[in-house]
Amino acid sequence: MSEFFLHSFNALSHGLIGYVVPFLFVLTIVVFFHELGHFLVARWAGVRVLTFSLGFGPELIGFNDRHGTRWKISAVPLGGYVKFFGDDTEASTPSPELLANMSAEERAGSFHHKRVGARAAIVAAGPIANFLLAIVIFAALFTFFGKPSTSARVDKVEAGSAASAAGFQVGDIVLAIDGTKIESFSDMQRIVGVRAGEKLNFTVKRGTETVQLQGTPEQREMKDPFGNVHRLGVLGITRQTAAGDVVTERVDPATALWLGVKETWFVIERTLAYIGGVFTGREAADQVGGPLRIAQISGQVATIGIAALVHLAAVLSVSIGLLNLFPVPLLDGGHLLFYGVEAIRGRPLSERAQEMGFRIGLGLVLMLMVFATYNDILHLAAS
């Protein structure tokens, strides 16, 4: 047992040295825009913003702007927060004593004295900013680097594979999967890869005819170029590419923006599908990762190039935006849940009920962090 933990520690200490800078680069971009969403809508709604912090804990460096907001970088770079006038904590829990003794002028700038719709808009602005950031990043990547458009042609069918059982033949070109247009081999790989065990309907061009096939991708463990193991859906089809076969299509900014929206929705859809699969037992929870895993992936992706690292930032931005919308007290979604109840009841929940909710939310978040970190350590030790 001691050897296992020693090996884990050595893997962590050796690996994280090369991962810290890319990790902080990615996380800082995502957190900054999340908090900027809260900040901008709060200012628009007339709320006085006391603090805009990247990180938690003691302040390392900061300054005050002309509106009295303290902008700072804090010691623990694993998130951030915006603190409003009237907040008791960084999680925007109210300070009953402060709220009770406010003057009319102070109430005008207090977050907790705003109408429930304004408060909901301020809270929702963080996750929305994450989604918008992802759309813009994806769109920029499509604009500057183009869109893969190598046809989804079948050059080889693995014997005994799902593709063989479905009736695929060499020379087939996949046109659509479950009605979704397939424009490239990578399009097909992405859909098949996340739908192991699901029956899929394929529209296939075979010579001059169009045929319909049904196949169920099988789940296999595949290693990426960095040695990380992923469980993916596989048909057993190979596309052999020669010089000139790999085509990248340039797209205009408007098309790139639409592709950015589609890419963002794809990440949202697959993330929700994975979470649903964990709860139903179809997916293993060992793929849930925390800061250590993100740091490792950031360092690995950084070796490919800045475009790949920025792409990772977009994916992480979607994930953080989505996570924050979960109806768990302490997260943005928990606040929105409370505001929804307040809108229906015509008055907020009692202080005791809200405090109990935040305690439960804190417990759930801490348990998730411990579980994710445990997974991270096992993953790093194995690699």
Feature-to-residue mapping (PLM):
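Functional transmembrane alpha-helices
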Residues: 2-14, 101, 105-117, 221-322, ...
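Small-residue-rich helix-interface/hinge motifs
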Residues: 15-99, 323-345
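Alpha-helical transmembrane segments of integral membrane proteins
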Residues: 22-26, 31, 311, 315, ...
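Internal alpha-helical transmembrane segments
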Residues: 33, 44, 80, 84-91, ...
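Pore domain of cation channels
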Residues: 123-132, 312-325
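Hydrophobic membrane-targeting alpha-helices
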Residues: 136-144, 321, 325, 369-376
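Conserved PDZ fold ligand-binding element
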Residues: 163-185, 264, 357
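PDZ-domain C-terminal substructure recognizer with occasional recognition of PDZ-binding tails
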Residues: 169, 175-176, 190-231
